């Protein structure tokens, strides 16, 4: 194999393909990145039996071929190269990378021992890359990180015709986002549970593409897989087994109090007051007509109080939240105005965004957050 490719193109492609390489591969070849040069294209692939990634870029190909090299090493080298065209060639058990006056020689791994990448499932539909990335980011923040509860580490993708609903929970908050897309089959109905971290990494990487193709396996080829493709990149991941708790009944539809606050001053106030909140201690919110009073700490230790303008419809209410979970939700609504809707101080509150103080709440994204019970 002998090829020539632009340094930035190579570095970006290698970083994408190598992102899911295992830190401790069960077999040495799984630490490798598979480079294949043919018909004016250089493809780079990785696979760890859970996640596969493949990207194709344009390259000048003098001699076609395939080589398997250490993915992390090639990623480090590609990132450090000067901004000059890069030549990659192979000679038996060695691969050579030349860029300007820099020259690297890498040992190759046995290509014949590398597993075949899983077949991409059939395309299910398409969604604009920015919409997909935004929706995933809004929902994945609520996914659990405890691997002993694998179901809660996933994002649930539910497809009903032209509507897609993403949902995740760690038991302390529940995030749900709906958006429209273009399905291949207008009558499609499907559910999948995708590892949240893999979905986040994929969504970020595919934002540069105009459209993202979502490919969900049915029975047959690619069963138990979901695939994503866009901007010359494709990835598959194995689905998690199980399903999230039935959540639609958890979201209240009637409220005793609804508070409306400008998001930016609310966020800044929570951050300041939380400075005195020790680990896992809550920030207390007291809503009255025209004002929100935030408090944290205790009289025995450091204490903080701040007042923020707020509109309140309904009864006055005092409630407490984990400040990190509250800030996550306020960041995720991505709106200038936040709406918090309450039933009681011991029941979950519903956070959503408004484009303006006097506008209706955006129903596309909902963030349900459990309150922290206060002693006494």
Curated annotation (Swiss-Prot):
Keywords: Cytoplasm, DNA replication, DNA-binding, DNA-directed DNA polymerase, Nucleotidyltransferase, Transferase. It is found in: Cytoplasm. Belongs to the beta sliding clamp family. This is Beta sliding clamp. It comes from Streptomyces coelicolor (strain ATCC BAA-471 / A3(2) / M145). One of its GO terms (cellular component) is cytoplasm. Confers DNA tethering and processivity to DNA polymerases and other proteins. Acts as a clamp, forming a ring around DNA (a reaction catalyzed by the clamp-loading complex) which diffuses in an ATP-independent manner freely and bidirectionally along dsDNA. Initially characterized for its ability to contact the catalytic subunit of DNA polymerase III (Pol III), a complex, multichain enzyme responsible for most of the replicative synthesis in bacteria; Pol III exhibits 3'-5' exonuclease proofreading activity. The keyword Cytoplasm applies. InterPro entries: DNA_clamp_sf (IPR046938), DNA_polIII_beta (IPR001001), DNA_polIII_beta_C (IPR022635), DNA_polIII_beta_cen (IPR022637), DNA_polIII_beta_N (IPR022634). One of its GO terms (molecular function) is DNA-directed DNA polymerase activity. GO terms for biological process: DNA strand elongation involved in DNA replication. PANTHER family: BETA SLIDING CLAMP, DNA POLYMERASE III SUBUNIT BETA. The gene is dnaN. Forms a ring-shaped head-to-tail homodimer around DNA which binds and tethers DNA polymerases and other proteins to the DNA. The DNA replisome complex has a single clamp-loading complex (3 tau and 1 each of delta, delta', psi and chi subunits) which binds 3 Pol III cores (1 core on the leading strand and 2 on the lagging strand) each with a beta sliding clamp dimer. Additional proteins in the replisome are other copies of gamma, psi and chi, Ssb, DNA helicase and RNA primase. It comes from the Bacteria. It holds the Pfam family DNA_pol3_beta_3.
């Amino acid at each position: 194999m002998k090829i020539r490719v632009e340094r930035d193109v190579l570095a970006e492609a290698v970083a994408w393909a190598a992102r899911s390489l295992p830190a401790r591969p069960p077999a040495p070849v799984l630490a490798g990145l598979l480079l294949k040069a043919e018909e004016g294209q250089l493809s780079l692939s990785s696979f760890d039996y859970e996640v596969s990634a493949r990207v194709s870029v344009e390259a000048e190909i003098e001699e076609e071929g395939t080589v398997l090299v250490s993915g992390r090493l090639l990623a480090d080298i590609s990132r450090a190269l000067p901004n000059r065209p890069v030549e990659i060639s192979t000679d038996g058990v060695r691969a050579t990378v030349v860029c300007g006056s820099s020259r690297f020689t890498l040992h190759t791994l046995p290509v014949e021992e590398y597993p075949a990448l899983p077949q991409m499932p059939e395309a299910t539909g398409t969604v604009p890359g920015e919409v997909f990335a935004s929706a995933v980011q809004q929902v994945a923040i609520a996914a659990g990180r405890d691997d002993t509860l694998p179901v809660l580490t996933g994002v649930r993708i539910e497809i009903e015709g032209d509507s897609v609903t993403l949902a995740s929970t760690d038991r302390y908050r529940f995030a749900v986002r709906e958006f429209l897309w273009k399905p291949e089959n207008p009558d499609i109905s499907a559910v999948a549970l995708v590892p949240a971290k893999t979905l986040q990494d994929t969504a970020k990487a595919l934002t540069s593409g105009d459209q993202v193709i979502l490919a969900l396996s049915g029975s047959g080829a690619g069963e138990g897989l979901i695939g994503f493709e866009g901007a010359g990149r494709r990835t598959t991941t194995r689905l998690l087994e199980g399903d999230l708790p039935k959540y639609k009944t958890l979201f209240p539809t009637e409220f005793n109090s609804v508070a409306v606050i400008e998001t930016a001053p609310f966020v800044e106030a929570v951050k300041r007051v939380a400075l005195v909140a020790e680990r896992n201690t809550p920030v207390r919110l007291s809503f009255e007509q025209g004002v929100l009073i935030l408090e944290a700490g205790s009289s025995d230790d450091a204490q903080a109080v701040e007042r923020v303008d707020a509109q309140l419809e309904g009864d006055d209410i005092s409630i407490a939240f984990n400040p990190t979970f509250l800030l996550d939700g306020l960041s995720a609504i991505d709106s200038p105005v936040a709406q918090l809707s309450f039933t009681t101080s011991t029941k979950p509150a519903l956070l959503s965004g408004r484009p303006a103080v006097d506008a209706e709440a955006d129903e596309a994204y909902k963030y349900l957050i459990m309150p922290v019970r206060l002693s006494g």
